[in-house]
């Protein structure tokens, strides 16, 4: 009368995975309109011959991006140098402060 004691259902064994040859045969035999090939395809294929105007615009955009990158790189280099100089100044000020503190403590002793 124990309802918790149910019989276990024995599942069939798993089939072996397909071999590479079987997969390739399946892919080669699939039609071109198979959802596997069309699901991720773009709706409109890109124009095979881009217009010269589009190419020039794209080249100009890339050129401007390159110029902006070079300018930003130079600004970062300058900022790094300024930061190093300020760090050195603070370190020297800290050393002077320690010297002054030691002089004051030795003078008061």
Swiss-Prot record:
Coiled coil (residue ranges): 73-104
Chain positions covered by the region annotation Disordered: 30-62
Residue numbers of Phosphotyrosine PTMs: 63
Pfam families with a match to the protein in the record: UPF0449 (PF15136)
UniProt KW keywords: Coiled coil, Phosphoprotein
Family note: Belongs to the UPF0449 family.
Name recorded for this polypeptide: UPF0449 protein C19orf25 homolog
Organism: Mus musculus (Mouse)
């Amino acid at each position: 009368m124990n309802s918790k004691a149910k019989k276990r259902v024995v599942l069939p064994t798993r089939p072996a995975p397909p071999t590479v040859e079987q997969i390739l045969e399946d892919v080669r035999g699939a039609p071109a309109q198979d959802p596997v090939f069309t699901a991720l395809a773009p709706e409109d294929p890109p124009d095979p011959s881009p217009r010269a105007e589009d190419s020039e615009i794209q080249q100009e955009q890339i050129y401007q991006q390159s110029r902006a990158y070079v300018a930003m790189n130079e600004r970062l280099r300058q900022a790094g140098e300024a930061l190093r100089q300020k760090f050195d100044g603070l370190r020297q000020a800290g050393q002077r402060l320690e010297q002054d503190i030691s002089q004051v403590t030795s003078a008061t002793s």
